[in-house]
Amino acid sequence: LVQTEEYAKRFIELGADAEKVYIVGNIKYDAVTTEVDFRKRNRLRTSLDIPSDGKIIVFGSLRDGDEKVAKKIWDELKEKYSDLWFILAPRHPDKKDIILNHFDSKDVLLRSENLKGKKNQGERIIIVDTLGELIQFYSIATVAIIGGTWFPGVDGHNPLEPAGLGVVPIFGPYMRNFQEPADRLLKDNGAIQLSDYNELSSILERLFASPYESINYGTRARKIILQNQGAVLKTINFLARCISK
């Protein structure tokens, strides 16, 4: 059982019987959330005092060095867009202090404090120092930036999570751990890959200036996810046939 035609070709080239190589797809697609209830999305926006027409950048799974990328983006865009909110979700919530050190505290609201009742007092940077909420934040995003992709060493995080929710994922050159889904999204124009984080602000400005472009990217991204789901069922059916023989 293999994920793609490319993998099938490789096994056959190595000597496998072509009639015994089956393409079932990538089970990672089956685990992707493709819808979050609009009431949950509205409650999340309301809890953070983000208007329905606010521009939201979600920078997910930040790793070492990504906080500098986030700071650069914020410094370049905060004055240009008064309706911009920047949501930063570190891969490890206990690293929030590293992020905090790069921003003015008066601009930052911690999600943990927000959940305890602290209201937004005009902060436009939200640090998600909680677990299990990234998908919800992706669901209200205008665009998503994938952490761990801008510097060598981590080799990427999952671009399928925002893609499944119709949000365009933007990632850097280091995607080895998620190369297949990244390539598939890029092939069908459902994601944006940049060679350098210095390009981020300009691409974000382009997407903000043309909302339909980001919407179309997101629509294509979600379609790619839906088209590639079903690998788990194919695998189970194949194994069931093998067992019954």
Across the structure, where does each feature detected by a protein language model lie?
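Nucleotide-activated sugar donor-binding and catalytic core shared by glycosyltransferases
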Residues: L1-K245
